[in-house]
């Protein structure tokens, strides 16, 4: 008798669920995926497509996207062999974890943090060690260092600025953790362009156990293009490259990246707008009774309300999509929403005043 299909699958799947965006991805006002509210201008898209038309479509791209990697290495000021480009930072995350984790390994994850870290680790049969954030959702660097030593972990992942809390770990604290740890340290800087803290990319020459993860989906407004990067000491990067899927990045992605980097003022202007709106929104939210605001170092804001899921559903009915993050540890009754255009932000504020406002 043949075995049940479930017996033939990775046993880790039994405790995992497929990734899902609650509420979907379509709405009149969409603020649930931390995207940029600004698309690329038409003239820049036309430049990209004109260049792409000249590329051979019947031939595979390079095994690795060397053009894109050289361009990004020059942009961030590191050697080209210190950079790896991927089909989105999530694909890079899978590659790094494949290179570094597996049975018998231990990973330390502060919680709450990006859910994909734990998911990939479980798939690779890696033991997960959690370190809770402090009550105000700030990182506990001392606890991370202490727990990493006690548990003899092999890998530490730090999302800073952190999704879903919106808070950062000071760059000096990141370095202190990397210096103290007998482990590889991955620093996910998906939201670094919005942060008050410095990037730690410059530290890879000094800290040989440091890996920095970057995405082009947030500040660079290229979520639809799927472009991510890892940056590390070249010797470490050579090992990370071994499980990398070949031919995973298209020529179109490389060309788009190069054109956006050549017109980076568009990114700078967009980030400036988002930061200004973040401050304005934060000020307005503080005046709404029944809403508790958390400090943000990202392009999104976290609020705590009395009944988060009911509010999430009511906003959805009113064609406004936000994210219910109540399922994360320490985040009961919390909602997350990214900064949109001013009129989108005003529409959200109006609904929050109608639905939440209570006497202070």
Swiss-Prot record:
Pfam families: Aminotran_1_2
UniProt keywords, alphabetically: Amino-acid biosynthesis, Aminotransferase, Histidine biosynthesis, Pyridoxal phosphate, Transferase
Signal peptide: none
GO molecular function terms listed in the Swiss-Prot or TrEMBL record: histidinol-phosphate transaminase activity; pyridoxal phosphate binding
An example Gene Ontology biological process: L-histidine biosynthetic process
Keyword Amino-acid biosynthesis: yes
EC numbers for this chain: 2.6.1.9
Pathway: Amino-acid biosynthesis; L-histidine biosynthesis; L-histidine from 5-phospho-alpha-D-ribose 1-diphosphate: step 7/9
Domain of life assignment: Bacteria
Positions carrying N6-(pyridoxal phosphate)lysine: 218
Transferase is among the record's keywords: yes
Matching Gene3D superfamilies: Aspartate Aminotransferase, domain 1, Type I PLP-dependent aspartate aminotransferase-like (Major domain)
Enzyme class: transferase
Catalytic activity: L-histidinol phosphate + 2-oxoglutarate = 3-(imidazol-4-yl)-2-oxopropyl phosphate + L-glutamate
Cofactor (UniProt): pyridoxal 5'-phosphate
Subunit structure: Homodimer.
Similarity annotation: Belongs to the class-II pyridoxal-phosphate-dependent aminotransferase family. Histidinol-phosphate aminotransferase subfamily.
Protein name (database record): Histidinol-phosphate aminotransferase
Provenance organism: Chlorobium phaeobacteroides (strain DSM 266 / SMG 266 / 2430)
